[in-house]
Amino acid sequence: MGKEYLKPTVFISGHRDLTQEEFDLYYGMQLDWLIIQEEIEFVIGDYDGCDTMAQEYLTEQGFDPSRVTIYHMGDKPMNLVNKRFKTIGGFKNDIERDSAMTNASTYDVAYIRKGKENSGTAQNILRRFTF
């Protein structure tokens, strides 16, 4: 039995210490193209850095918040830029949460710095190809 059909859903991930310049360079144009796609949805974590910048970017662009889901550990997100975003929580650790986002998505938008090939962001991309 195959994987059930998922709407085109993008998992945005990246470094916690991502600069605004890096976000604009490595994410901005991709997100600009993606947000005009009719059925696209996004899944994002709730950490500082890339996660929060992505939440802010989608909000600033007027993207429909009902098509954004924030995944978090524990009872509530650490960072939730738009209270209209959906949330899914209760995960015990980063790997469990990130695995759930991989399973809920069909594409990745991510940037991995040179020397950070073993980062959580890199693991998120590799996970897509091991299912």
Feature-to-residue mapping (PLM):
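Acidic/glycine-enriched connector segments
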Residues: 2-8, 16-131
